[in-house]
A protein has these predicted regions:
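Anion-binding alpha/beta catalytic cores of soluble intermediary-metabolism enzymes, centered on
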Residues: 1-342
Length: 342
């Protein structure tokens, strides 16, 4: 069976991106799980490898289709020389980051690989689809993101809350193989107000009508403070800080963001760390979140395959419904009625 192909952006060239990538694939464990395809610069990779005294081997390729299994592959999408100035923000590093992101984006759209993982420092686009913050304790989805707090209430409608609950439910079932997942929906206000009563509650009730187990709305402070989050498979927060801040407080080195596009297929994961310029070139970067992102996307892809296969040909109905006979034979219904009257 062909291994899953993972497209990887190289992060900020003056940060810890290449350190994390080279360390992660220094041992064969991840190479046995997937075929990594880094969009970047072999010369910059060699610079970091030498500076950090690492022994990771990689293969330089020009196109993702040339990627070899059991090897770290680097697509040479940056042809020009890139000066590495560890720990510094520079225009060259900014440009190299953009080139890598754009090349990986094109590769993902062209299906040259199965999923994308970003190195620390790269920002994923969350404009469309569902983004979930994941650690070993919980999963938090955001109703709104990248908008000012003053505009949040304008984006909270009953239709949007209903849609996000349904998206999260589908994601938990298909991506994480959870049967009947429990979803907690957070309130917008610390005390129940108009939004909770007229917008969020009706959306939760509609979810129940659609056989989705959603509860709430819960005030965020008491919900996280009482550790109620431990009893739910997923949480829907109304805005960025409401979900992100408690998640960061509760999380540790395993934290990642997972984004599933609206098409239900395009998948991107990223560790939550930034470029970590302060420790660039010192060999102190932690690879746990990056590795967790790799593990997560491979698990999700396999779960999706199993889920889609199971739901493609559902089991036939194992009982006989007399009502179906009545619909086909209207005289049968009259006969049943006569027998009951006797």
């Amino acid at each position: 069976m062909e291994r899953i192909k993972i497209g990887i952006t190289h992060g900020y060239t003056n940060g810890v991106g290449y350190e994390v990538i080279l360390k992660a694939f220094e041992e064969p464990t991840l190479l046995e799980l997937c075929t990594p395809i880094v969009y970047g610069s072999p010369k910059v990779a060699s610079y970091h490898r030498k500076a950090l005294n690492l022994s990771t081997n990689f293969t330089t390729i020009q196109h993702a289709e040339e990627a070899l299994e059991n090897r770290l592959n680097i697509v040479e999408c940056i042809q020009e020389e890139v000066k590495v100035d560890l720990g510094q923000k520079t225009e060259e590093a900014d440009r190299a980051t953009t080139i890598s992101l754009d090349a990986a984006k094109r590769g993902l759209a062209a299906k040259h690989f199965d999923a994308q993982v970003m190195a620390p420092g790269d920002k994923m686009s969350t404009a469309e689809g569902t983004t979930i913050l994941i650690n070993e304790r919980t999963r938090v989805a955001l109703l709104t993101d990248n908008i000012s707090f003053s505009d949040v209430s304008k984006h909270i409608t009953s239709e949007e809350v209903s849609r996000k609950i349904a998206d999260l439910d589908r994601c938990l079932k298909r991506d994480f193989a959870l049967s009947g997942p429990r979803i907690a929906v957070l309130a917008l206000n610390p005390e129940p107000g108009e939004e909770e009563e007229n917008i969020i509650k009706p959306a939760i009730e509609q979810a129940g009508d659609n056989h989705i187990f959603a509860m709430g709305p819960f005030a965020a402070d008491t919900f996280f403070g009482s550790q109620a989050y431990l009893h739910y498979d997923g949480i829907l927060a109304m805005y960025h800080d409401q979900g992100y801040i408690p998640f960061q407080v509760l999380t540790n080195e395993y934290a990642i963001a997972l984004h599933s596009a609206e098409d239900g297929e395009t998948l991107t994961a990223a560790p939550l760390e930034d470029a970590q310029l302060a420790i660039a070139g010192k060999g102190e970067a932690n690879i746990t979140s990056f590795c967790n992102a790799i593990y997560t996307v491979t698990d999700v892809l396999r779960n999706r395959e199993r889920y889609d296969e199971a739901h493609q040909n559902p089991l036939p109905k194992l009982f006989h419904d007399k009502r179906e006979d009545n619909r086909r034979n209207p005289h049968a219904e009259a006969q049943n009625k006569t027998e009951k009257e006797k």
